[in-house]
């Protein structure tokens, strides 16, 4: 609903079976605005232990948080222990990341469609790496391609301390 209010339209549905994710991408009619990809973890496909941890997290959230204007970047609304994080990480990197960071962008992708100096994603990747950015190489530096009407690369986030309820790592 948050993107629809801004004029974005749902354009594509995706299934990442190995990661237990369902995703959707949104586009604004103004093609200078970014495409947005939202993914959802299929919690019911995780173990009962992982499901219980996630339920405990969700139960700590005030119901009103999902309607707030800042919901998409509102961060973590729960306490989670390092052991709970590790349990989630053992099953799903996505679940563990969400437990640690909450609601916020996981990564950003580079669109070459509007660049004037190059129209090759490989050139953009080279520029990013030369500037010190680390690319997400899981599945290759370039994901997708002409067959799915999308080719993308993404950078990795910097390392940062994560505060759990019982320790900071």
Describe the residue ranges of each PLM region.
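Extended, well-ordered protein cores
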Residues: 1, 11-169
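The feature marks the mature, well-folded catalytic cores of soluble enzymes
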Residues: 2-6
